[in-house]
Amino acid sequence: MALLQIAEPGQSSAPHQHRIAIGIDLGTTHSLVATVLSGKPKVLNDVQNRRLLPSIVHYGDNTTHYGEEAKPFIIADPKNTIVSVKRFMGRSKADIKFQHPYELVGSENEMPAFETRAGRKTPVEISAEILKQLKARAEDSLQNPVNGAVITVPAYFDEAQRQATRDAAQLAGLNVLRLLNEPTAAAVAYGLDQESNLATDRNYVIYDLGGGTFDVSILRFSQGVFEVLATGGHTALGGDDLDRLIVKWAKKQLNIDVLSDEDYAVFIVAARQAKEQLSTQDSVELKLLEATLTLDRPTFESIIQVALDKTISVCKRVLRDAKLELTDIQNVVLVGGSTRSYAVQKAVREVFAQEPLCTINPDEVVAIGASITANQLIGNSQDGSLLLDVTPLSLGLETMGGLVERLISRNTAIPVARRQEFTTYQDGQTAMLIHVVQGERDLVEHCRSLGRFVLHGIPPMTAGQARIEVTFQVDADGLLTVSAREATSGVQAHIDIKPSYGLSEADTERLLIEGFQHAEEDKNLRHLKETKVEAERELEALEQALKVDADLLDEKQLEALNSAKGSLKAQLEGSDIQAIEQAVQQLKVHSDAFAALRMNRHIDHALKGTKLDDWSKSN
């Protein structure tokens, strides 16, 4: 499918010159690289004819091992063997709650580094090592340098996690054409647009359960256009978690409370093997230390049911977001190695009441879709479809009273830009703090802060006179830039949102679920805050007017005005909206009379020294 005809970085200016573009699935458990050869996508093998590169890096005394060569060290040297590094990407040390054998260093609010035999290594550096291996594989296989790459990320990755992925790619020497959502890549791989001869719209569910992340997206194909209607997921739910549930069961069976790092690694390997074998066998044996356990399919289903229930809950919520019923879904596409599990396929089949599509190798489908997109973006091919990704969470900024003004709503198609005018709150205000937030709630304190910057140089004016245009721009990779410009002076400032850590799975889930649960409460609270802000603005304006023209009021009038002011200030201490609004109206009775006196004075001052003839001449 042809994306919007906008030149991307690295795009060929010579339309008939074939350039090498690759698609990379940078996975939690495995990673792959694919390209398009003679019009057909192909997953590239290494010199030993292996397609999957385990996402593992081992740091030895004098050498570094990757992939399959690093696997034996998971048990032999777990502290120096980094597995599932994707789960650490763009996350703060405080966010990392899951069990792991590593020594993490750094402050709680920053992305940590792993303490290894080769020194401290960040998740970005380790991911770059994996990407370098894939790039080298592609160049060895194709005997040509790679001109550009599309790298896939979970649809639910936030700003920090996407930026960390792009940083890793650049560190690996890759020209990043685009970061592409994994479910979107799967849609491209399946060529769902080939059903374009159908007159009716087609809706598809992409159920992607990988090694460490879960994503579900609903795509609609209509009149040659792919659109992502809604997305959801968990940034830390996947095959790794199924393995951990099996380990938890095994520990209970063997009456073990705590495992050493070395023994835990043994249990994880055995659990993973058992999970894979149960896709084709009714029961398997787990050899754990000096004990052997038997695990059958029904027991396995009951063990992982809690994880499956989470994925189904997300599916139902995304259906609600898209305003669709189960009967509106034409196909369900399975993506990710964990969907090979018969238990996963059974759960999906029962929920959607149809046989899911899994004709393409679920481990390879994302890389294949990425390679097709890369081939298009590099300028090698064009066809008739358009692909629109969406923002996973709403983006906005803080206004007076700690309220959130949303500029870009969740599930908005990207790339996108939104502009909105704001103004100053106080007389003579010469600077404005722009606080950018992400989330679904109406109060800043309930959303996630993405960054702050200050617009300086605003000309001093009366409150409400300045015009500040704020622009939110999300690019095709889902990365956000915010700019602000004052209209009369032209002064401007901007920020590229590059936070040092991302949302934990708990925070991501909280932002969405609380947004739904507290919608009515937030609406009422927003009304209260807005009412208070407007009342405080009235009081501030009145205070300034009294400093200049209080002599216009006699003692009785001033006393009545001050009494109404005091009454309003007292009501502002509470949370009774109706009482505040009544106090505002009572104050307006006196302040309007005062305003009329002020206007008369200013008119008299303006007319002083003029004659009637002057007015006649002007007419």
UniProtKB/Swiss-Prot annotation:
Origin superkingdom: Bacteria
Signal peptide bounds: none
Cross-referenced Gene3D superfamilies: 1.20.1270.10, 3.30.420.40, Actin, Chain A, domain 4, Substrate Binding Domain Of DNAk, Chain A, domain 1
Coiled coil stretches, renumbered: none
Keyword list, A-Z: ATP-binding, Chaperone, Nucleotide-binding, Stress response
Record InterPro entries: ATPase_NBD, Heat_shock_70_CS, HscA_NBD, HSP70_C_sf, HSP70_peptide-bd_sf, Hsp_70_fam, ISC_FeS_clus_asmbl_HscA
Species for this entry: Acinetobacter baumannii (strain ATCC 17978 / DSM 105126 / CIP 53.77 / LMG 1025 / NCDC KC755 / 5377)
Matches recorded under CDD domains: ASKHA_NBD_HSP70_HscA
Biological role: Chaperone involved in the maturation of iron-sulfur cluster-containing proteins. Has a low intrinsic ATPase activity which is markedly stimulated by HscB.
MF annotations from Gene Ontology: ATP binding; ATP hydrolysis activity; ATP-dependent protein folding chaperone; unfolded protein binding
Protein name, per record: Chaperone protein HscA homolog
Family membership noted in the UniProt record: Belongs to the heat shock protein 70 family.
